[in-house]
Amino acid sequence: MISRTLLKRSLPTVQFLRPFTRSSIRRSAHEEDLVNLNELPRQKSLEENYVPLINPTEKYKVQIEELHKFGTYIMACLPKYVQQFSVWKDELTIYVAPSAILPTMLFLKNNTACQFKQVSDVTAADYPSRTNRFDVVYNLLSVRHNSRIRVKTYANETTPVPSITPLFNGANWFERETYDLFGVFFEGHPDLRRILTDYGFEGHPLRKDFPTTGYTEVRYDEEKKRIIYEPLELTQAWRNFTVGSSVWEPVGEGKDFTPESFKLPTPEPEPEKESDEKK
């Protein structure tokens, strides 16, 4: 009986010792595979890692020269339509009038040196201070020559731009998106209607004069169990902040850190003019 009790008391110690001894054996076995950090090569100095900045004109020097030649070639082929061209880095942009869009696109699509048979994007940019406030931008891709070109024209709120959908079927939805977001009309488009905004939407969201909050509020009405449109209600009344004013209310007297040499002298009050009765 005594031997059995001693054996039972010794068992827990054996159970705790076995995993400890195994882990020590594993640790000693893997110590040979560990890497000595002191023997690793040191990191290079900052001077060796420093890469000098390269001027973009030098980096794209070869491409810029070739694009200038290609732009000159297009102007020589279409002197009646192409007004000018510009090159920035590896991008060529030609500028045409709205009436020259179709013949220019036809030339860029079918000419052997061009072969721009794919429309990547059609978009616009809004410049409200200009007479023709919209720049309509066409991005074309030539798979055969692995090159791209950008065509720009101009328009306003009432002047339409000829649609290139008869030449490029892929421009259908691009022109609808440009009409929806900017309000540019494309003459000859087979289905010129909104594509992103909701039915009955007012205005064009990407115009610079379009308010950030929009004109109406769209929400789900629990009583009517449907989406409803309501006039927009702002939680704060509209305020016109003049230059130099702060949106936050000042607290305390405040401190002026402007040096004395930069401060303007306080003007003296003008003398009061005597009235005609006193004279």
Curated annotation (Swiss-Prot):
The keyword NAD applies. SUPFAM superfamilies: Nqo5-like (SSF143243). Induction: Expression is down-regulated during stationary phase. Expression is repressed in the presence of nitric oxide. PROSITE patterns: COMPLEX1_30K. GO terms for molecular function: NADH dehydrogenase (ubiquinone) activity. Its main location: mitochondrion. Residues 1-27 form a transit peptide. One of its GO terms (cellular component) is mitochondrial inner membrane. InterPro entries: NADH_DH_suC, NADH_quin_OxRdtase_su_C/D-like, NADH_UbQ_OxRdtase_30kDa_su, NADH_UbQ_OxRdtase_CS. Disruption phenotype: Leads to sensitivity to both cell wall-damaging agents calcofluor white and Congo red, as well as to thermosensitivity. Also increases the sensitivity to oxidative stress agents H(2)O(2) and menadione, as well as to osmotic stress agents sorbitol and KCl. Impairs the yeast to hypha transition. Increases the phagocytosis rate by host macrophages and causes significantly less damage to host oral epithelial cells. Its EC number is 7.1.1.2. It comes from the Eukaryota. It is a peripheral membrane protein. It catalyses: a ubiquinone + NADH + 5 H(+)(in) = a ubiquinol + NAD(+) + 4 H(+)(out). It is an enzyme of class 7 (translocase). Core subunit of respiratory chain NADH dehydrogenase (Complex I). Core subunit of the mitochondrial membrane respiratory chain NADH dehydrogenase (Complex I) which catalyzes electron transfer from NADH through the respiratory chain, using ubiquinone as an electron acceptor. Plays a role in cell wall integrity and is involved in osmotic and oxidative resistance, yeast to hypha transition and the ability to damage and invade oral epithelial cells. Belongs to the complex I 30 kDa subunit family. This is NADH dehydrogenase [ubiquinone] iron-sulfur protein 3, mitochondrial. It comes from Candida albicans (strain SC5314 / ATCC MYA-2876). The gene is ALI1.
